[in-house]
């Protein structure tokens, strides 16, 4: 059975069809350097991911299976990591894994799903993408008997499992820490979001629900951050908002629904000398944690267990191809609040 050093017990949640949209391409500053790269080959839609070869297990249920790992966001650091973990684990079990990236193009993602279905892939893993956006193409996979798994995506009927974090709970955790511990229940806040992403939608729903409980906290603006270059775009957005709000203490905090815009916001604040403004994020990527440790404006994030999500997907695929019954729905990997006190 697949096990790549699981670090936590995963909880199974009831199946829930998420109505959100598409996962974020969280790219980090390496400006967006990736560990897994894709090179399209032929009509079979095979794509090769770079990286060290994993030791292969002969004769398992996954041996010889062709698995298509598909995402619109391979430039995202966390998406790239998940795709890499999945590729490594499945190849260790003898599967042939094709990582397919559509570079933020969802029409292309739909087309590529059609191609892998028609070419006879044995399984699909949708990474960091809302299945509602490609529901018709996934239905073709379901009709063809091809199992579809999600990794930090949404879940729709017909899929096997989506491994993710409890995004609403993460939103509650970081928003209450921001409002209570960092803002003291009063002030003004900017919301940096990307509501096409199903996880971000849930985090922002938590923000929207909780801010109603705080009459002394005012939302200045909600700003959409594009997924392609979120650090740079968030930096520009916040720089413009600082120009429009030049007085010290006119902005108390920036809530970023994932770490890349939090990093961009922090850069803008540092350049403007606005040390009084608080920033929080979600994901727990290395650059964000370093900024927290260094005592910058970025004060907290929620660290997701992306490796744990990949482990869940691979274990569930192993069970599926072994003929074992899978309890369909969402499975959650636990998340952790990171502050300067516990940042490592």
PLM region descriptions:
Residues 2-12, 25-344:
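A residue-level marker of the well-folded mature domains of exported/periplasmic proteins
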Residues 13-22:
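Bacterial N-terminal signal peptides
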